[in-house]
């Protein structure tokens, strides 16, 4: 009778006769590691011994397969090999099946593996090119030619005669006298004032000394000597009466900072340019003394400058124009601006279907030292755009009929990632000081004015100013001229960042102008034309040919071009190109991409599980020695790793319980010890809980 209480100490290698082979036995291999699990009671013999089957009872049943309820919710493959084999057998990607079907031919397997990897590389290289093109945000320019009625643009015409205001008339006359005296001192030029004033005028030094920053003739210093590198910017040598040598002198005036620690000369090689800039500098100071509310102009209304005005063969009226004053270009009149109740529309092209003006261009000699051009200044612009006469205007010549033909062009650009433009200027870090919509020129002038106010403490008179800020005047800000010319030099070099801050608008409308000139009026017709103009306007034209000019502005054609940008590569086209490349190299669909994603996910999960098992086997496995024995004794059987084959606990088989059938006794002859070995016994399949040793990987 077997002693079941000693079973855990047995370490016998059994050799059971499980076959009818001539040798009658099968030997197992010796175990290299002692089994820590106690053996279960024997419930039967091996299937190979028929005699013992009949003696011991019926054959044990086959191991029960797990049902769906007992299977894990999510199962993964046991190894990478099994995963890749399953993928190659079931994927819809062309060529993958060849890796499995040709596994018995290593050369074919290697060939298809290399070909498959090269195909993947080529495809993803094409993918990289497609993504690079998409994220470069290219645009396509679409050109559309449209034909329709067109809104006539706004037209601004200026007299080119800066006007003398009543409030500053005496100051301007004093400036004229000082300028003429300066010309006499520097060039011995006798103007009408110097010839008529005679002894009534003050002495030269008294008259010029009353005005700061006098105009001087400066001798150009020699080239700088390295031994004298610490010369200041005001190193030009002043000489009131040097010998005139064009290679050795310049004309200019000195400007200094607040504490006179830094000075420089604003010089010009041309005396005409120097006199005009010097006069302009003092003229700006005088204009700054005007009140904020513009005074009434002494000049007569529109009829004193514009003899005739017609649009589409209909006469103009006072509601068709607005008036403002420009410091350099005099009185200006804007036709068809945004304040016009009914904007002019052009339904036909040609000179007879546009704006026709007859202008008076006689020079009234208001400020001859400031205005040296005769004629008129004209600019074509949008209704909601200010007229920057310095930037976009052109001059009309007296005695000439100037015909300006226009072509409208519209440009719609893409902003955001596709281009550096702004929709309405709200995202531009510059405050719009003009009562108009955003344009790039509006932003640039506003940016300069902001820097002028910030660094010089006053506003430049040519640009609008915010409330609470005064225009620059050297009687209040003595060093504003020094600050202004320094700032102007930095502005020209874009050191202020105005050109980079002020982005172009996304929607721009331009008018392409073409000019034609002809003599007007002709010799045969000038007598009656001048006579009619004089009678009509109650004004006698003294210098007939230089006293009038004709201006025609019209659309050359009603066809206008619209240039619009659109993305060259959209998300739809990108996906289409990616799908085309995928189909080209693998002949697959979107579901194949999902299969690839599933493969990558399975690889990551299997790797994570294997790392977790390695971590647990390294840090949580039972130790060796007495400490390990205690840990094993105190560890529940269910917590052992699968290699320890834990079995469910049951009462000792040596003590049968009442009401139950005692276990069968082992009546087989004892095994031959010469054939002892760790032969796998079929009894293990009938042992409850033996499925815990299965290597399946499940969650």
Swiss-Prot record:
Gene Ontology CC terms, in alphabetical order: acrosomal vesicle; apical plasma membrane; ciliary membrane; cytoplasm; cytosol; external side of plasma membrane; extracellular exosome; membrane
Regulation: Originally identified and characterized by its inhibition by the diuretic drug amiloride.
Disulfide cysteine pairs (residue numbers): 158-332, 256-263, 309-316, 421-506, 443-483, 443-502, 447-498, 456-483, 456-506, 458-472
Transmembrane segments: 111-131, 590-610
Motif range (PY motif): 669-673
Annotated site (Cleavage by Furin): 205-206, 231-232
Extracellular side: 132-589
Cytoplasmic side: 1-110, 611-699
Signal peptide (residue range): none
Tissue specificity note: Expressed in kidney (at protein level). Expressed in lung (at protein level). Expressed in the epididymis (at protein level). In the caput and corpus regions of the epididymis, expressed uniformly on the luminal and basal surfaces of the ducts and in the sperm in the duct lumen. Also expressed in distal colon and, at low levels, in liver.
Region (Gating release of inhibition by proteolysis (GRIP)): 200-270
Reaction(s) this enzyme catalyzes, per UniProt: Na(+)(in) = Na(+)(out)
Principal location listed in the UniProt entry: membrane
Single GO MF descriptor: sodium channel activity
GO BP: cellular response to acidic pH; cellular response to aldosterone; cellular response to vasopressin; intracellular sodium ion homeostasis; multicellular organismal-level water homeostasis; regulation of blood pressure; sensory perception of salty taste; sensory perception of sour taste
Topology in the lipid bilayer: Multi-pass membrane protein
Keyword tRNA processing attributed: no
Subcellular location: Apical cell membrane; Cell projection, Cilium; Cytoplasmic granule; Cytoplasm
Family recorded in the similarity comment: Belongs to the amiloride-sensitive sodium channel (TC 1.A.6) family. SCNN1A subfamily.
Quaternary structure, from the entry: Heterotrimer; containing an alpha/SCNN1A, a beta/SCNN1B and a gamma/SCNN1G subunit. Interacts with WWP1 (via WW domains). Interacts with WWP2 (via WW domains); inhibits the channel. Interacts with BPIFA1; the interaction is indirect via SCNN1B and inhibits the proteolytic processing of SCNN1A and SCNN1G and the activation of ENaC. Interacts with the full-length immature form of PCSK9 (pro-PCSK9).
Full protein name: Epithelial sodium channel subunit alpha
Source species taxonomy: Eukaryota, Metazoa, Chordata, Craniata, Vertebrata
Gene: Scnn1a
């Amino acid at each position: 009778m077997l002693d079941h209480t000693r079973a855990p100490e047995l370490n016998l290698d059994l050799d059971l006769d499980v076959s009818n082979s001539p040798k009658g036995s099968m030997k197992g291999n010796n175990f290299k590691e002692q089994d820590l699990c106690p053996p279960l009671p024997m419930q039967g013999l091996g299937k190979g011994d028929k005699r013992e089957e009949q003696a011991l009872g019926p054959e044990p049943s086959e191991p029960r397969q797990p049902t769906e309820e007992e299977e894990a919710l999510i199962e993964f493959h046991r190894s990478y090999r099994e995963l890749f084999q399953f993928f190659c057998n079931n994927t819809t990607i062309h060529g993958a099946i060849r890796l499995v079907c040709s596994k018995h031919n290593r050369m074919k397997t290697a060939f298809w593996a290399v070909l498959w990897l090269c195909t993947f590389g080529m495809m993803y290289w094409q993918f990289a090119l497609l993504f690079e093109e998409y994220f470069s945000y290219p645009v396509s320019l679409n050109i559309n030619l449209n034909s329709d009625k067109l809104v006539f643009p706004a037209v601004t015409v200026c007299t080119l005669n800066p006007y003398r205001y009543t409030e500053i008339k005496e100051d301007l006359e004093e400036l004229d006298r000082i300028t003429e005296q300066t010309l006499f001192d520097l060039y011995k030029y006798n103007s009408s004032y110097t010839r008529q004033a005679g002894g009534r005028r003050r002495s030269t030094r008294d008259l010029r000394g009353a005005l700061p920053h006098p105009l001087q003739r400066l001798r150009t210093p020699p080239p700088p000597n390295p031994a004298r590198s610490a010369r200041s910017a005001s190193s030009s040598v002043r000489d009131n009466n040097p010998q005139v040598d064009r290679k050795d002198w310049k004309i200019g005036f000195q400007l200094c900072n607040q504490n006179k620690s830094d000075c420089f000369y604003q010089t010009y090689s041309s005396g005409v340019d120097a006199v005009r800039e010097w006069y302009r500098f003092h003229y700006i100071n005088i204009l700054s003394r005007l009140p904020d509310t513009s005074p009434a102009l002494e000049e007569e209304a529109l009829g004193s400058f514009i003899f005739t005005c017609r649009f589409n063969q209909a006469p103009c009226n006072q509601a068709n124009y607005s008036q403002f004053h420009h410091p350099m270009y005099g009185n200006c009149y804007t036709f068809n601006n945004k304040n016009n109740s009914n904007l002019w529309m052009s339904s036909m092209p040609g000179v007879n279907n546009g704006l026709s003006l007859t202008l008076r261009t006689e020079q009234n000699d208001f400020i001859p030292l400031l205005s040296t051009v005769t004629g008129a200044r004209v600019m074509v612009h949008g209704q909601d755009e200010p007229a920057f006469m310095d930037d976009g205007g052109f001059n009309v010549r007296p005695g000439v009929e100037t015909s300006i033909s226009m072509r409208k062009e519209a440009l719609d650009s893409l902003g955001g990632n596709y281009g550096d433009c702004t929709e309405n200027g709200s995202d531009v870090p510059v405050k719009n000081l003009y009562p108009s919509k955003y344009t790039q020129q509006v932003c640039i002038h506003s940016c300069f004015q902001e820097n002028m106010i910030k660094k010089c403490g006053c506003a430049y008179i040519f640009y609008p100013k915010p409330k609470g800020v005064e225009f620059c005047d050297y009687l209040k800000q003595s060093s504003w001229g020094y600050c202004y010319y320094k700032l102007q030099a930095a502005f020209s070099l874009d050191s202020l960042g105005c050109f980079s801050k002020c982005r172009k608008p996304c929607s721009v409308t331009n008018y392409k102008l073409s000019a034609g000139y002809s003599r007007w009026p002709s010799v045969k017709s000038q007598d009656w034309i001048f006579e009619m103009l004089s009678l009509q306007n109650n004004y006698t034209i003294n210098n007939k040919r230089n006293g009038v000019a004709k201006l025609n502005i019209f659309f050359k054609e009603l066809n206008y071009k619209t240039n619009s940008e659109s993305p060259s590569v959209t998300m739809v086209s990108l996906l289409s190109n990616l799908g085309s490349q995928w189909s080209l190299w693998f002949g697959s669909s979107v579901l194949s991409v999902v299969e690839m994603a599933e493969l990558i996910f399975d690889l990551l999960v299997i790797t994570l599980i294997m790392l977790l098992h390695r971590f647990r086997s390294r840090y949580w496995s039972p130790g060796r020695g007495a400490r390990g024995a205690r840990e094993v004794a105190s560890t529940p059987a269910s917590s052992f790793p699968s290699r320890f084959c834990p079995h469910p606990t049951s009462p000792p088989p040596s003590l049968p319980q009442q009401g139950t059938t005692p276990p069968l006794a082992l009546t087989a002859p004892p095994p031959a010890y010469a054939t002892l070995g760790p032969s796998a016994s079929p009894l293990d399949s009938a042992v409850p809980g033996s499925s815990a040793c299965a290597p399946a990987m499940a969650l």
